[in-house]
């Protein structure tokens, strides 16, 4: 495992995100939803959700979304996925903790993560 980081997803990431969401190994963690380029551009523009590209040693390996509740206080949750080759190495818990810590430092009062009940690996993380 290299240096773990996250960065804001940009319009340049749309082809990557569309491709990831078309992967059956990702689809199972995303309610089977696939997206066109236009739909992904719309998703990036949502005011209540920020999308983050997860990187391992500078290579993109997954996505986290931070979503906000509409009413104060500032609170919300995280959800996301890793590509198959990045799973099982502690990447998601490490980056999710870092992002949650940064959100709290930015004034969030609560950050939740609610993996699927069948996703035992995520629950253990």
Task: Please give the residue ranges for each predicted region.
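Conserved active-site alpha-helix within GNAT-family acetyltransferase domains
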Residues: 89, 93-94, 117-125
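Conserved GNAT acetyl-CoA-binding A-motif
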Residues: 105-116
